[in-house]
A protein has these predicted regions:
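RNA/tRNA-interacting regions in translation and RNA-turnover enzymes
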Residues: 1-148
């Protein structure tokens, strides 16, 4: 950050950005109601439709071998949850949000749990939200059912 303040985006994004900075873990969020079909994290074959936030309305499809969250309509996030797309972006009108904390280092699993718990508490406290599902996805526990 080099001494520069982090700008405000929206209440939900600001909350997960604060937790991301506190725990030094990647966090993200998407509009769950904008998903088409199931969300999957996978290595892409390339060509998944994706319009990135902040760069106009140009389709920028995934590349072969890229790791991305995808649904039946295309890419939701690219490079894990780093590059958000327009189609599923959180807005002031989002009714059901998908918030994610990522951690690929098994040594930091407790940090991941703590970040997830703190994010849930802040979202409930400051946004009046109800947490429907809070699960840790691992190699041995590979999926969660999320129903808005």
């Amino acid at each position: 950050l080099k001494g520069n303040p982090v700008g405000s985006i929206s209440p939900s994004v600001d909350l997960y950005n604060a937790i991301s900075l506190k725990y030094a873990l990647p966090l993200g969020g998407e509009d769950l109601d904008a998903f088409e079909g199931d969300l999957r994290l996978r290595i892409t074959e390339g060509g998944d439709a994706f319009t990135p936030l902040g760069e106009g309305a140009e389709n920028d499809p995934t590349l072969p071998g890229e790791l991305a969250y995808v649904d039946d309509a295309g890419a939701v996030c690219r490079c894990w949850n780093w590059r958000d797309g327009v189609r599923t972006a959180l807005t002031d009108n989002t009714g059901n949000a998908f918030l994610i904390v990522e951690c690929v280092d098994p040594e930091r699993i407790e940090d991941c749990r703590a970040a997830t718990e703190e994010l849930a508490q802040l979202v409930e406290q400051h946004l009046g939200a109800t947490i429907a599902v809070a699960e840790l996805i691992t190699y041995d526990h590979r999926e969660a059912i999320i129903e808005p």
